[in-house]
């Protein structure tokens, strides 16, 4: 479900019951079907579909979140996270991710290089350490120790964009 549709439906669902109340009120059936997965942007819809597939098979919400986030992390066309993601000023793709379960346990990684699925590393941090967040070299060392593969995440397209940026970055931005 797209975010705008969800908000419109939810807002109507909140207002409508108050308009229908009378002296002989009867329970109003909740029309919201659960579970639901929403995205802010259209490029998030493939992640929603993957997450919903997990939920429809009675998988956990935590599994659905991880599987859903892995979709854009693996999509070089997304360029928001993961493989083919935006580079830093030195041409490195550095990634962050965090995840939380229904009990309030959390795991996160930041400034993680060369690991395609930081969401899965963040989950490992949550489930297998006493830490909430690992950063940089420590996060990468942890990921490699837990079987994650080192990969070059800078695609040709992203590298070409970085080279173009590098040529004129002082003129067009605040670096």
In which residue ranges do the predicted regions lie?
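N-terminal secretory signal peptides and thylakoid transit peptides that target proteins
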Residues: 1-14
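Hydrophobic h-region of N-terminal signal peptides that target proteins for export
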Residues: 14-22
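Bimodal feature
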Residues: 2, 23-27
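Alpha/propeptide regions of enzymes that mature by internal proteolysis
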Residues: 10-11, 26-175
């Amino acid at each position: 479900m797209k975010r705008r549709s969800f908000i419109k439906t939810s807002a109507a669902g909140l207002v409508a019951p108050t308009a229908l109340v009378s002296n002989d009120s009867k329970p109003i059936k909740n029309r919201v079907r659960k579970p639901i997965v929403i995205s802010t942007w259209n490029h998030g819809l493939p992640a929603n579909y993957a997450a919903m597939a997990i939920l429809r098979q009675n998988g956990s919400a935590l599994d659905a979140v991880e599987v859903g986030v892995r979709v854009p992390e693996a999509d070089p066309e997304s360029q928001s996270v993961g493989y083919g993601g935006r580079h830093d000023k030195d041409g490195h793709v550095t990634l962050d991710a965090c995840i939380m379960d229904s009990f309030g346990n959390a795991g996160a990684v930041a400034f993680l290089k060369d690991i395609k699925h930081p969401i899965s590393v963040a989950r490992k941090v949550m489930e297998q350490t006493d830490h909430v967040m690992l950063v940089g070299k420590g996060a990468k060392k942890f990921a490699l120790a837990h079987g994650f593969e080192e990969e070059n995440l800078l695609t040709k397209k992203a590298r070409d964009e970085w080279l173009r940026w590098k040529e004129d970055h002082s003129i067009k931005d605040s670096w």
